Design a protein with these regions (language model features):
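An alpha-helical, amphipathic repeat domain used for nucleic-acid recognition
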Residues: 1-152
């Protein structure tokens, strides 16, 4: 019983310091019996320390604005964390699209510059598209930026 209380305190401090989702905390509580771990999770949710919808919004906002991830990569990462589909959709809707587009252009422009020494245009295009798809951008978005950068 004492171990459960100690872990609850640790998880409260962790959740107070940064956003966490249920799957993150569940993984950290693996040492506890399943019933005790569920009780800790329920307490964290009830007291407002843990909210998957809030986590999804913060995750999507940060990955888009700070790391330049596209919506497809964000969606996949949230699915891996077992976030509900409605929370994922709401988080993706909350992304600041003009800022995300500007960040995407900045990231892809930097990649384009790094490919300047590539002499074969087909290889240059393949590397550019592979990189951009890996960042989670959609094909139409990538094509628009590629056409724009290819004219420079």
């Amino acid at each position: 019983m004492e171990e459960k209380e100690k872990l609850l305190g640790r998880m409260m401090r962790l959740c107070a310091g940064r956003e966490c989702c249920r799957s993150d905390i569940r993984r950290k509580l693996a040492a506890l019996p399943p019933a005790a771990a569920q009780e800790v999770l329920d307490t964290l949710c009830r007291e407002g320390y843990l909210d998957d919808a809030r986590y999804a919004r913060a995750f999507a906002r940060d990955k888009s604005a700070l790391q330049g991830w596209g919506s497809l990569k964000i969606q996949l990462a949230l699915q891996r964390k077992q976030i509900d589909a409605t929370d994922i959709a709401a988080a993706l809707e909350a992304i600041d699209l003009p800022a995300a587009d500007a960040k995407m252009e900045q990231v892809l422009r930097a990649k384009w510059k790094s490919l300047a020494r590539e002499e074969d245009p087909a290889r240059k295009e393949a590397k550019f598209f592979r990189y951009a798809l890996g960042r989670g951008y959609g094909y139409q978005e990538i094509k628009r930026i590629y056409d724009y950068l290819g004219r420079d």
